[in-house]
Curated annotation (Swiss-Prot):
GO molecular function: iron ion binding; S-ribosylhomocysteine lyase activity
Cofactors demanded by this protein: Fe cation
Gene responsible for this protein: luxS
Substrates-to-products reaction catalysed: S-(5-deoxy-D-ribos-5-yl)-L-homocysteine = (S)-4,5-dihydroxypentane-2,3-dione + L-homocysteine
Any single biological process term in GO: quorum sensing
Protein name per the record: S-ribosylhomocysteine lyase
């Protein structure tokens, strides 16, 4: 296959083993700032996916809560394939700390009693949420914490 512009299109999705957290890209700005993008893969590509209401609530919960654990977050976004998220951090290069930040954020999800910004003023599809679904996805990922640094099958 020809090399593509999008990093994830060059990843052989048949060779990865979810769940995992991998460095997906690094960009250096003109003034020396470095942004690292991480692939937080919750589900095995082309085998399973997160259902939208749970994924949507997980996005809200993670996007809000991750910023309580680091001030380096540029963005946290869901993947269109519904198998994971991307998180981008600026001037932060400690992979183990990234794993700890994600773990703490997902523990916040489990402790949540509501989905932040789950209303028509703050959300573009407020009817599509599931706190319970988000908690199930988070718990499943946390249960496999020891696998997060293993991206490919051996």
């Amino acid at each position: 296959m020809p090399k593509m512009n999008v990093e994830s299109f060059n990843l052989d999705h048949t060779k990865v083993v979810a769940p995992f957290v991998r460095l997906a890209g690094t960009v250096e700005g003109a003034n020396g700032d470095v942004i690292k993008k991480y692939d937080i893969r919750f589900k095995q590509p082309n085998k399973e996916h997160m259902k939208m209401p749970g994924l949507h609530s997980l996005e809200h919960l993670m996007a809000e809560n991750i910023r309580n654990h680091t001030d380096k977050v540029v963005d946290l976004s869901p993947m269109g394939c519904q198998t994971g998220f991307y998180v981008s951090l600026i001037n932060h290069d400690d992979y183990e700390d990234v794993l700890n930040i994600i773990e703490a954020t997902l523990k916040d999800v489990l402790a949540a009693d509501e989905v932040p910004a789950c209303n028509e003023v703050q959300c573009g599809w407020a009817a599509s949420h599931s706190l319970e679904g988000a908690k199930e996805i988070a718990q499943d990922f946390l249960d496999k914490r020891d696998q997060w640094d293993k991206i490919f099958s051996e």
